[in-house]
Amino acid sequence: MTADRWTQAVREQLGIGRLLPLGDARDGAWIAERAAEAVLAGAVRRAPGVRLGRLRIALADPEDAEESAVPAPPSALPFGPLRVTAEFAATASRPLPATAALLRETLATAAAQRLGLTVSDVDLRVTGLLDEDAAEQPAGEEPELPPQARAEDGDAGVVAAAARAVPGVLRLTGTLGRPVHLEEVPGEAALTHRHVRLEVAVAADHRSRDVARAVREAVGAALPDRPTVAVVVSAVG
């Protein structure tokens, strides 16, 4: 890899943020923090009289988190309920507690129904009041999907084909390196087995957790040795 390509890869990896757990430890799936935040912010844009500020998603209780049943990708958080923290400004057209309740419900619903995140807490902080004329949310930019990953061959090609055939998969991406990563990992009784990590962009009209689960099943069945599989959702678009 040239210096320019290495620099670009590092920037892309830093840009997607941490990897948030999708589902529970048995699911073996994560979503890029940036992708999850974009979906939640997009849901809030349709809420009347409120403008979202800084948004953050993190483990609600790191000490109570559970390690994944499969090898985790770099920068992946362990599994456990998440806390969404958000700042917002609102108009005075309704009481602030009512606006906060609407915003809390909007964020929690989008996290659960559109992504499949397990959110236990939504913490909000009011940062200011908006004039009625300024209350309209600025139009959000269309999510920029990572570039289509290059074609794979061999077993990686088999994995890629199985993943692309799953409904809801837009493309394979490579922000963490190669789109399909195969490796030998230690198993029980000092035996090794193969592990597959792959990265996908998911359609916005499909629940990310469900797509990731279907990808894991398809990839696991596509190879005769039935490797363990981890799926990273890098973008939702």
Question: Which residue stretches match the model-derived regions?
Answer:
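Short, non-transmembrane amphipathic alpha-helical segments
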Residues: L40-A43, P95-L115, R207-P227
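Extended, hydrophobic interaction surfaces within ordered domains
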Residues: G80-A134
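C-terminal interaction module
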Residues: G157, A165-G168, L172, L182-H206, ...
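Surface-exposed beta-loop interaction hotspot
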Residues: Q113-L170
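Short, hydrophobic beta-strand segments
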Residues: I16-D27, G80-T91, G140-P147, T192-A204
